Amino acid sequence: MADLNGVLTNVPNHFTTQFDSNWKHLVQQKNSKLKEYVTIDSIEGKEKSYNQIDATSMTQITDRSKDTRISDQAMAKRWIRPTQYDCAKLVDEWDEQLLGEVVLPTSPIIQSHAQAYARTCDSIIIGALGGTAYTGTTGTTATALPAGQKVAVNFVESGVAANSGLTIAKLRAAKFLFDSNEIDEEEERIMVVSAKQLQDLLRTIEVTSQDYNSVRALVDGALNTFMGFKFRRSQLLGKVSTVRSCYAYVKSGVILAERGLKTHMDVRTDLSHSLQIRSVASLAAVRMEEKKVVEIACDEA
């Protein structure tokens, strides 16, 4: 049909809609942010123990030909026990035909599983930083991160204590604990915080401060080191009410034991020949020494 001016009026009713033939991942953390900064180990069997030996001291000799003085050597064990994880998706046997020109999402699903694995690694590492470590001969003694290795949410260097986010004072407190514990100065010190802590840190510094440009670059991502800590941002850090637990640690302070990610693709005859894409992993992490980890409580109210 045409109008009085000869313009076809029904043509718009037949305009087509184009559909993308590919799949795009929605926003998410795609790579592990912490795995590179812990000690990676392999594991066989249901559990693994790590032998530890404590510091000893020498005694001055004051007499000639005196009986040899024997002192016991303090030793310890740390245990790690892997947990199994999986993720499975089904692709119906008719999906390839029904999707038409749209490709089957098999590759994007496998990529999605790998991204989930990366986030799981980070969550397990974070859990080990502040969680319970098992020690003793049989690994049944629960060892918590002591209060002496924690910077309180209301910590101030002077004046009246008040809840706060991440401050320069809290960073100094964490550094002091590491220095007091004689943490090897050659070991890289990692600081895991969320986006809110980076903003808080910038807010607490005056523009005229000599630290301002460094923190500004830290927030902008142009710099990742400040006050001797390499900063890693993670939104997976635990939060209770308005208080988020952030962590400072060194690489030797945490072990992540893994068997790697395995992905299986099988046709399920019991499910109408659907294609099953299933990824499995076995993971565990343990805090190796309490003195190598500092928990910093940050208010996000």
What are the residue ranges of the model-derived segments?
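Sequence/fold signature of self-assembling virion shell proteins
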Residues: 2-34, 39-58, 79-81, 146, ...
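An anion-engaging/catalytic patch
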Residues: 61
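Alpha-helical scaffold segments that mediate packing/assembly in large oligomeric complexes
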Residues: 96-177, 295-301
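Oligomerization/assembly interface segments of phage tail-like spikes and tubes
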Residues: 84-87, 111-113, 231, 277
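Short, catalytically relevant binding-site loops at active-site mouths
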Residues: 131, 196-200, 237-238
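Residue-level signal for secondary-structure boundary elements
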Residues: 35, 121, 125, 137, ...
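Structured, hydrophobic secondary-structure cores that serve as assembly/anchoring elements
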Residues: 49, 55, 76-107, 171-203
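Active-site-surrounding "flap" and adjacent substrate/cofactor-binding loops of secreted or lumenal enzymes
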Residues: 64-75
